[in-house]
């Protein structure tokens, strides 16, 4: 049952078609990389949940709720809806097993999804365990989670992938 999930998350064994677009991660030295690109490149440490050739998922260190995950394309683009259609499809397929793992790992009604894109100029999806719509209120105060708590959350989600 878990083998298809691991196959999908592992680009070497995935039988899903990769996005056909010729988008590539930005390599220009003229513009600074976004914080998400620096996380993907390993310049900034993160609590990685999953990764494949095109996408990267990691914990938000200022979570709305415990289990808040960010899913980002490795290609830098400011607006999620500027991605080619095949990338949009693939990012949701990449996020789906992570969302299901979040639902299993935390006491919630479902995993909420949000696309806002105002704080970081790099397309991303928020996956948040929720019990009601107020749990996705990004105006509420958020505090930085401790490294110990983030590590526990990371392990909890990964255990359900």
Specify the residue positions occupied by each region the protein language model found.
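Arg/Gly-rich low-complexity intrinsically disordered repeat tracts
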Residues: 10-32
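HIT superfamily nucleotide-processing domains
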Residues: 2-9, 30-161
């Amino acid at each position: 049952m878990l083998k298809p999930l691991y196959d999908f998350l592992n680009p070497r064994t995935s039988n899903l078609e990769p996005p056909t677009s010729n988008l590539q991660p930005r390599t220009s030295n003229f513009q600074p990389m976004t914080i998400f690109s620096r996380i993907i490149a390993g310049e900034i440490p993160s609590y990685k949940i999953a990764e494949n050739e095109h996408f990267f998922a990691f914990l938000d260190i200022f979570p709305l709720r415990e289990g808040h995950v960010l899913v980002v394309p490795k290609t830098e683009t400011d607006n999620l809806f500027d991605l080619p259609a095949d990338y949009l499809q693939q990012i949701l397929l990449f996020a789906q097993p992570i969302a299901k793992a979040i639902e299993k790992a935390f006491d919630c009604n479902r995993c909420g999804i949000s696309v806002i894109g105002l704080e970081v100029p790099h397309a991303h999806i928020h996956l948040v365990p929720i019990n009601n719509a107020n749990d996705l209120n990004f105006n509420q105060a958020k505090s930085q989670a401790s490294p110990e708590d983030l590590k526990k959350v990371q392990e909890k989600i990964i255990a359900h992938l």
